[in-house]
UniProtKB/Swiss-Prot annotation:
Organism name: Nitrosococcus oceani (strain ATCC 19707 / BCRC 17464 / JCM 30415 / NCIMB 11848 / C-107)
Residue intervals of the EngB-type G domain: 24-198
Keyword RNA-binding: no
Listed NCBIfam families: GTPase_YsxC
Binding site for GTP: 32-39, 59-63, 77-80, 144-147, 177-179
The encoding gene: engB
Gene3D superfamilies: P-loop containing nucleotide triphosphate hydrolases
Entry keyword set: Cell cycle, Cell division, GTP-binding, Magnesium, Metal-binding, Nucleotide-binding, Septation
Binding site for Mg(2+): S39, T61
MF-aspect GO terms: GTP binding; metal ion binding
Name recorded for this polypeptide: Probable GTP-binding protein EngB
Annotated family: Belongs to the TRAFAC class TrmE-Era-EngA-EngB-Septin-like GTPase superfamily. EngB GTPase family.
Amino acid sequence: MNSLYRKAHYQGSAYTLSQLPPDEGMEVAFAGRSNVGKSSAINAITGIGGLARTSKTPGRTQMINFFQLDARRYLVDLPGYGYAKVPEAVKRQWQQTLSAYLEQRRALCGIVLVVDIRRLYQPFDLQMLEWCRSRGLPVRILLTKSDKLKRGAANQALQKATTHLQEVFPMARVQLFSAVNHTGIEAIQAQLDEWLGIGG
């Protein structure tokens, strides 16, 4: 692991676009449905337990959370979508904010889409891929919680996910990931290194 990830620290949160930090430097955002393990993935990638808050309550992460690696580089935890028990008006606001962030944020240089390996490509995942394709953003898909399946089943799910992706977004890449047994951590770190311009 590059030591820069271990220097990650919470920088701030934004509920609206006006609260975002200055649009400069480089950011990689983590997106996904509620309770797919985005926060756990960020914690595992940085090696800092508890950096990004995790919760058994879906939708708990309702703000855009920024984690700073250095003066120019950030990891961003986007709001989870799908199960949050909030009014529809709030959900619409989240979607508008997310859409605007993806379309307008110049510092954004890549998206990590976190997908539960047992529930491949829900409507939100496909919407996210469409947003990224229209913007020309590179995407890395983490099939998280791969430890929940036996190796054969996990590899079968990976093949299925990869085949489907070739039809909808051939530029994206898919990998297995588990925050529990650390499957795929080095692979996603290598991708982040490339996007963020981090040396060895």
